Amino acid sequence: MAFDFKKEYKEFYMPKNKPEIVNVPKANYIAVRGKGNPNEEGGAYQQAISVLYAVAYTLKMSYKTDYKIEGFFEYVVPPLEGFWWQDDVESVDYTNKSAFSWISVIRLPDFISKADFDWAVETATKKKKLDCSSAEYLTIDEGLCVQIMHIGSFDNEPATVALMDTYLEQNGYVNDINKDRLHHEIYMSDARKVAPDKWKTVIRHQIKKA
């Protein structure tokens, strides 16, 4: 049975639809940075997703090649995630999607080293005829966070974020969001197959004591 991050780490991927506080350990990711409307057909975001999955599946299937990764075991590619922000605004305008900057990521198993990652980028670029040079090996240490399972369209996120903010205020915490600590989403539904009102998205913000 392949290792499935969603099942082994349910506390990070399947929170309840009410706010909760968690301590998220440091982890490594495949990451691609960009800016612009994520819904733009053939735009930077969709290109970034193609790169992420090309590298992710090259690593996942590496055991069927001559390249051997030390400590490798079979695993399910974890869900797509994203860190989002808008420059020069006091509050996020969810309707102005072209103003978003983002870092799209997919988590890596701990046994995958930077050298393994570099091999996968080179291999995916050659085999899939897709320039994967925009992918980077990124380590993220989120630490103390508030999170919730948002059900529904991304456009309805402000109401869910307001619930999170109220919960923090009631429990003696504040958001700790800045240019290095960003609004974090984990996409638990396939948007191509699930109706928008049923999309499941983990929303996570880093926090600190008030």
Where are these regions (language model features)?
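A solvent-exposed interaction/effector surface
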Residues: 1-210
